[in-house]
A protein has these predicted regions:
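Disulfide-stabilized extracellular ectodomains of secreted/luminal proteins, especially beta-rich
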Residues: 1-277
Length: 277
């Protein structure tokens, strides 16, 4: 189906699903003619009464995209966040130009008092090591973490050319940010490559994740659809990833680039990100 470009300034709510807050209310976020806006409405699609103010909604930037054709993701997490309050986690573009891709958690409010208890958290702005032109395909919460799945330009391949890798990123729900100037950035953000390939001496890679699925009855497995690059030999595959294997990678060694012309290599010893409850 083709979309008439003349219709793109209209408001779209399709990039993100509706999230039920309770039996009667929904959280929605839309592009709002390239000016993202979020709101809470009744499940029958009518507005809340004036006395039913919901703190923290109105500005949808970094929560949903400017462009309805962007590949974005979001998940409403009800438990495990700082202060025990619900929060929206999202992966999208925070600027109209798409220069600022972000994994984001909005300000956290106490809905009983309307008071902001915790400020937003996000990936470091304009840092291609964090995110490099990502296309998000999904997000899930499991235990203490929220996981994001996406494909992006592979920064570790830059010295050899340009290619796309698939990723899984993880943040801790309890994350309250770094120190000093990094207080609004994630302190627990990690990402790793997802490898979907036909094994052998010369593996054949399906580098571009297209969709992700986790069974509602099983928090230990993810199933993903991958494809080859659109300019190469066309192919697709379904690969499954066990959560224990994912966590083993996140607990393992990091890669680093010693100089701008060096290869990316594992650091000498493992570094760990510890959640403080």
């Amino acid at each position: 189906m083709f979309v008439d470009s003349l219709k793109l300034p209209l408001n779209f709510f399709s990039p993100l699903p509706f999230f039920p807050l309770d039996n009667d209310r929904l959280y929605v976020c839309g592009t709002n003619a390239h000016s993202p806006k979020d709101m809470v409405i009744y499940s029958n699609m009518t507005h809340l009464a004036r006395h039913e103010f919901y703190a923290g909604v109105g500005d949808g930037i970094a929560k949903c995209p400017f462009d309805p054709e962007d590949n974005s993701t979001a998940i409403w997490v009800k438990t495990g966040n700082p202060g025990g309050h619900p929060a929206l986690y999202s992966g999208t573009n925070a600027e109209f130009t798409k220069a600022d891709a972000v994994i984001f958690r909005g300000d956290i409010f106490d809905q009983n008092t309307g008071r902001r208890e915790y400020t937003y958290k996000r990936t470091i702005k304009y840092d291609s090591h964090m995110l490099d032109k990502p296309d998000f395909v999904g997000s899930y919460e499991v235990g203490d973490y929220v996981y994001f799945f996406f494909r992006e330009t592979a920064v570790e391949y830059m010295n050899c050319g340009k290619t796309i890798y698939s990723r899984i990123a993880r943040v801790c729900k309890k994350d309250t940010g770094g120190k000093n100037i990094l207080h609004q950035n994630w302190a627990t953000y990690l990402k790793a490559r997802l490898n979907c390939s036909i094994p052998g001496d010369f593996p054949f890679f399906f580098n571009e994740i297209q969709d992700i699925f986790k069974p509602s009855y099983d928090d230990t497995i993810f199933h993903a659809v991958f494809s080859t690059n659109q300019n190469g030999l066309h192919g697709s595959a379904i690969c499954s990833f066990n959560l224990d294997d994912i966590e083993e990678v996140f607990d393992g060694k990091f890669k680093e680039q010693a100089t701008s012309t060096s290869m990316w290599l594992p650091v000498p010893s493992a570094r760990y990100v510890v959640i403080v409850h």
